[in-house]
Amino acid sequence: MKRIAVIPGDGIGKEVTEAAMHVTEVAAATFGIDVECEWFDYGADTYLKTGVGLPEGALESLRDDFDAIYLGALGDPRIADMAHGKEILLGLRFGLDLFVNYRPVKLLDERLCPLKDRTVEDLDFVVFRENTEGAYVGVGGIFKQGTADEVALQEDVNTRKGVERIIRYAFEYARIHGRKSVVMSDKSNVLRYGHDLWQRVFEEVRVEYEDIESWHLFVDALTMQIVKNPAQFDVIVTCNMFGDIVTDLCAELQGGLGVASSANLNPQTGAGLFE
């Protein structure tokens, strides 16, 4: 028996999640898998009533009692800063150490692609985004807020452990799934410290995978190449913020966020959050 925790989210998220669960039921029946789903009302309505996105003990229960988590879209105009969405999504990503953000880029129908004369074969690659570090860890602060001397600091945190495990996972995925190349993207020509670490770790890891072609692209060059010639890519790996931006570009080339899938994974523990 596989147990799935379902968090339908807000607005259209609830409708999409309900439809997705019908697909899950059919898939489970087709492949002979016993699935039990439990729904959790973590979203804007509950947050407005309680002031809490993830209640006490929820993280531990989701980690220990379920095989996977389905999460619908979060967002409500009544909560302008998306505080509940950040608490739920980032709480799960960081709390469950879901360091792999897996974003397959696959064009299902040529009519959905805004690029001229692209076929379904042209868009078929995978982006791996580091999911627990970088500029999204929330380290920073504001000094002298509201004055002419206001200063805002936002730290970009990169650890050798975090960088190595996502780069290594990208290479392992490429090897297992028959992908021929891995591209690492950063901005080390400007971000001389954090992304120098990315460069050095990439060079160290790539020599262990001589059967896989690998190269480096600065992120601005990567975005141009994705638009110009997406067929050249098999696997892309990058940091948290750049991955967030690049995968939205890739989603639009597929036809929009509505047809772009996303998984947040920890291959070491087996935890998985699917959006």
Regions found by a protein language model. Give the residues of each.
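Glycine-rich phosphate/nucleotide-binding loop
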Residues: 46, 225-275
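Buried hydrophobic positions in well-ordered alpha/beta secondary-structure cores of metabolic enzymes
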Residues: 10-13, 67, 128, 170, ...
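Glycine-rich phosphate/diphosphate-binding loop of Rossmann-like nucleotide-binding domains
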Residues: 5-22, 26-28, 147-220, 232
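Short acidic loop-to-helix transition motifs that present clustered carboxylates
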Residues: 110, 217-224
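Short coil/turn connectors at secondary-structure junctions
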Residues: 1-3, 33, 64-66, 97-98, ...
